[in-house]
Amino acid sequence: MYSINRIGIHGISNKILSRPKFFHSSSSIFSLNQNLNNFKNNNNYILNGYNKITHNHHHQTLFHRHYSNLKQEQENKQQNVGKNSETSPSSTTTTENITTATTATTKTDIKETQNSTMSMLKTVFKYLWPKDNNDSKIRIITSVLLLLSAKVLTVQIPFIFKDIVDSLTTTQSEMLTLPLGLLLAYGAVKITSNGFQELRQTIFSKVAHDAIRDVSCSTFKRLHQLDLTFHLSRQTGSLSRIIDRGGRGINFLLNSILFHVVPTAFEISLVSYVMYTTLGWEYSALSLATIAAYTVFTVKVTKWRTQFRVKMNKMDNEASNKMMDSLINFETVKYFNNDALEVERYHNYLKEYDKASLKTTSSLSFLNFGQALIFSLSMTAMMIMAAQGVVQGNLSVGDLVLVNGLLFQISLPLNFLGTVYREIKQSLVDMDHLFSLLNLNPKISDNKDSKPLKLENGTIVFRDISFKYNDSVQVLNNVSFECEGGKRIAIVGSSGSGKSTLLRLLYRFYDVSSGSIEIDGQDIRGIQLESLRKHIGVVPQDTVLFNDTIYYNIAYGNPNATKEQVENAARAAHIHEVILNMKNGYDTVVGERGLKLSGGEKQRVSIARAILKDSPIVFYDEATSSLDTEKEKLIMDALRELFKGRTTIMIAHRLSTIVDADEIIVLGTGGIILERGNHQQLLELEGKYRSMWLAQQ
C-alpha cells in the first residue's frame, strides 16, 4: 500500500496507460459498455484507494520516506570532505541566487521560475540531443516513430469493433468467417500497439537516464566548484534534494511532453478528423467542445488545488527536516532525556500535514467528479445522436460502438490531464532550482590569467592583510608576517582571534578584504586553485571522515598511493597498530563522519592522510588536540622529522607542542598581532604568551 502513495497519481497513470485492459473480449455493444464501466470503476477505486492510503497511512509512509531522505542526505554529505570544519562567524547572508538555491526544497509551491521555460528546455535539449552522440538521436527518432505508429493503430480498434458488431447482423454463413478475421485483426492490432509502446519505453529510457546522469554530474561538479560561503549557508539536506527532485523533474517532463502531451494532441486531432469524415461534423464539434470544457475545468481546478498541495508539501518538508534533525542529534536527545519532546514535536507537524492532506483529498474528489460529469454528459449526448441515426437508418449498430469507442479513446489520456499539468508545473520549478544551482558562479575561481604555482623554497608572506566575514566584525586587521621556506611558524591566541581564518585565506576558501598573501613572490589570487591546493597539506581541527573504510580515508590523501605507502603513513601517525587490532583492520568502516572512531583515532587518520599527500607546505590546525600527552609527543616528533625542511604553519592551544617553532605569533582579539618571537623571547617579554604558558603549567 505504501508503493501507491510513493508513486503518486502520475505513476498510476503510467501503469494504466501502458497496460489498458478494456476491449479485451467484447463482441457486442453491451460488453463494450460494461468494460468501459468496469474500467472507470476500477480507476475510481484506485484513486479512492490512493486517497485513503494518503489519509490513513501517511504517518507510516512519511516516516519511511523521511528516513530514506535522511539516509540519502547523509550519503551525499559524505561526498564533501572538510566542509564541516571549524565554523566561521560568517553571516548566513548570501547572494539572492544562492539563497534561492539552498532553500529551494522548502519551497515546493508552484510559482514562476527564474529561468524561462524555453531556456530550461533548451538546456535539457543539449543533454538530450548531444552533438557527438548519434545513438541518442537515433533512439529519440525511433521512439517518436514507434509512439505515433502505436497511436495510429490504437485509433483503429474502435473501427474493428464497429465491423465486428455490424458483421453480427449479417447472414449466418458470413458470420462464420468475418468476425473471426476481425477478431484476429483486433488481436494483431492490440499486440502490435502494445509492443510498440513497450519497445518505445525500452529504447527511450537509456536516453532519459543518460541526460539525467549528465545533468546531475554537472550540478555535483558545480557544487564542488562553489566557495565555502555557499556551503556554510546551505540547509541540511537541501542540495541533495534539489538534485534528486530536479532529476526526477527532467525525467517526468521528458516523458510527459514527448509521450503524453504531444501524442495526446496528435490523437485528439486524429480522432476528431476521423469523426468528421466518418460520422459528420456534429460529432467532431461535440468532441472538441468536450475536450475544451474538460481542459479548462481541469486546469482551473488544478490551479485552485495547488494551494492545498503547497501546504501539504510544506508540512511534509518540515516534518522531514524535524525528523532528520532529531535523528542526527540522537545522542543529544538521550543526554537530556527528551524523547517524548521530540515525538510530540514530530506529531504536531504530522497533524498539520493531516489538515492539508484532507483538503487535498477532498479537492481531488471534486476534480474527479467534475471530469466524469463532463465526459458522461458528452457521452450521453453522442450516444443519443448515434441511436437516433441507427433508428433512422443513417447509421449502423456498429457506428454506435464506434462513437463510444472513439470518445473513450481520447478520454484515457485526458483522464490524467490535471495530474500531468500540475506535475509539469512542479517539474519546471524543480528544474529551475536545479539549473539555478548549475548556473551559480563561485566567488572564488580561476581567472583567464591564472597560472600554476611555481614553487621554489615555499616562502609565505602575509602582507598587511585584513578580513571580515560579510558584514561581521573585523577578524583580521592589518596582519603582516613572513614564514620563510622550510621554517616552522606557530600561531596562538584566544578563540575568535582569527587563527583558523588564516588557513582559509591561504587555501583561498575566502579572499582577503585588503592586502595580499604571496607564495614565493606570487600572489595566490593569480594562482590556479588546483595548483595552489595541491601544494598545501592540511590537518584540520575538526576531522570529518567519509563513511568508508579506514584504508579509503587514509588513501584519500593520495588515491594513487600503494598499500605500502598507506601503511607507512599510518605508522608515522601512530595508528597502524590500532588499526590492526580492529576486527576488519584497514577494511573497518568508520561510520558517518567517522563517528565509530574516537576523537584521537580520527585525528590520527587525518594526520596520516596529510602525510600521504606529501605537500611541500603543511598547515596544522590544532592537529593533536584530541590526543593524550604521550601520543601527542610521539606524533609531533614523527611529524617534525617527516616534514623537516618544509614550510610549516601550526595553530595550537597546547603551547608545549610549539616550543621549538622558529617563530611564534600571538594574535589578539580583532586579529591584531600582539607579540612575536621564539618561545624563549616571548617568555622574557612577560606578556600574553607568558601568561598563557604559565596557565598551562
Curated annotation (Swiss-Prot):
It is a multi-pass membrane protein. Residues 460-695 form the ABC transporter domain. Gene3D superfamilies: ABC transporter type 1, transmembrane domain, P-loop containing nucleotide triphosphate hydrolases. SUPFAM superfamilies: ABC transporter transmembrane region, P-loop containing nucleoside triphosphate hydrolases. The chain crosses the membrane at residues 140-160, 176-196, 252-272, 279-299, 366-386, 400-420. Residues 77-107 have a biased composition (Low complexity). It comes from the Eukaryota. Keywords: ATP-binding, Membrane, Nucleotide-binding, Transmembrane, Transmembrane helix, Transport. It is found in: Membrane. Residues 140-426 form the ABC transmembrane type-1 domain. GO terms for cellular component: ATP-binding cassette (ABC) transporter complex; mitochondrial inner membrane; mitochondrion. The keyword Membrane applies. Residues 73-111 are annotated as: Disordered. The keyword Transport applies. Its main location: membrane. ATP binds at G493, S494, S495, G496, S497, G498, K499, S500. PROSITE patterns: ABC_TM1F, ABC_TRANSPORTER_1, ABC_TRANSPORTER_2. InterPro entries: AAA+_ATPase, ABC1_TM_dom, ABC1_TM_sf, ABC_transporter-like_ATP-bd, ABC_transporter-like_CS, P-loop_NTPase, Type_1_exporter. One of its GO terms (molecular function) is ATPase-coupled transmembrane transporter activity. Belongs to the ABC transporter superfamily. ABCB family. Metal importer (TC 3.A.1.210) subfamily. This is ABC transporter B family member 5.
